[in-house]
């Protein structure tokens, strides 16, 4: 599973997940092994949008990760930038609705 995930990223890609940066393919491999495969994360996609060539994917996350202070239904937004068929940037963000 980890090899398949990592194969979608460029060698110098950036992942930002929970305000942490993972630069380069080896850091992304460690992130995917520990936090996706290791925590058995599943994502049920709820929305996919194209925004000026970038892809935005919203989904319900579940898995064996620490859910302390998280809502029962965790929706995260994933912002993908893709160049030459590879992910160059992935930002994983827990958004909240604007109050105005």
Regions from the PLM with identified roles:
Residues 1-12:
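Short, well-ordered alpha-helical segments enriched in acidic and aromatic residues
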Residues 4, 27-30:
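Alpha-helical elements of Rossmann-like donor-binding domains used by nucleotide-donor carbohydrate transfer enzymes
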Residues 12-23, 34:
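A short gly/proline-enriched turn/hairpin at secondary-structure junctions
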Residues 29-100:
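A beta-strand edge to alpha-helix "cap/lid" segment located at domain peripheries
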């Amino acid at each position: 599973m980890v090899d398949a995930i990592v194969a979608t990223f460029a060698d110098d890609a950036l992942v930002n997940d929970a305000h942490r940066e993972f630069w380069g393919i080896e850091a992304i491999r460690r992130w995917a092994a520990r936090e996706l495969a290791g925590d058995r994360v599943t994502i049920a996609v709820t929305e996919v949008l194209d925004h000026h060539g970038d892809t935005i994917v919203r989904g319900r996350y579940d898995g064996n990760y620490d859910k302390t202070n998280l809502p029962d239904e965790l929706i995260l937004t994933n912002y993908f930038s893709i160049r030459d068929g590879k992910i160059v940037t992935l930002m994983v963000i827990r958004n909240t609705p604007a109050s105005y």
